[in-house]
Amino acid sequence: MSEPTEHTRATISVSSKGTQLGEIVLRFYHDVAPGHVKNFTTLAQEGFYNGTTFHRVIPGFMVQGGDPNSKDSDRASHGMGGPGHRVKAEFNSKPHKRGVLSMARSNDPDSAGSQFFICVADANFLDWQYTAFGEVVTGLDVADKVVTMKRDGRDNPLERVEMTVTITE
């Protein structure tokens, strides 16, 4: 697996109930968050994200995915899984505006693993608190579709919204 460059892109193919909702294409901020970019692209190249879901969607805020527990139909554990390793925080000056890709974490700043989120609205209260490591190039309308889906009390969509992630140069 090669090192990510400024030309590296990720394509998230999104589907629900066997119907394609579209693709979200991402470019990365490898200059300010190289560890997070490397982690995400490596996990994607290994197929880690394939079959995971967008397990947390909050209108006016973001869509979150990347939890391996979301492959299980038991939603009680969704949002609690990871890859078995952590990535050190790389907080940076990139603002959490609409379309920004950032890494989810627990209260520990150095606890990011595999879960990520895409802002569907500006969220500057996250600046310098979470690691922004990329942005949507095309397909933000797909995230907008996902964020409006009916969800349960934990903001988990009632219908599975699965992803497949591929990396290209």
Question: What are the roles of these predicted feature ranges?
Answer:
Residues 1-169:
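Cyclophilin-like peptidyl-prolyl cis-trans isomerases
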